Amino acid sequence: MMLDTALCLERFAWFIGRHADLSVEALALASDPAYVSVRNRFSATLMESVTCSENGSFVTSWGYRLGSTDDVESAAARLAFLLAAMPA
């Protein structure tokens, strides 16, 4: 069975939205590759784009593996930590 990366990215964006300091700037599901763009609301420079690989890993634009689709909440929390965000 193929991984539905669009659904995984939608779930990732939802968990990002639970962090008060983070904002989902774009959810580009029709792009190749599809991605979520996230930024810290209080910084013009703290931002990151995240893709979902076919093997089920969330990966930043610079190649850092945030976690797997088996635990989307933890992957989103790891990005929140990297972007210096506080939990809601």
Give short role names for the model-derived ranges.
Residues A30-A44:
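Short, structured protein-protein interaction patches enriched in aromatics and acidic/basic residues
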Residues L27-L29, T51-S53, L83:
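Short beta-strand micro-motifs enriched in acidic
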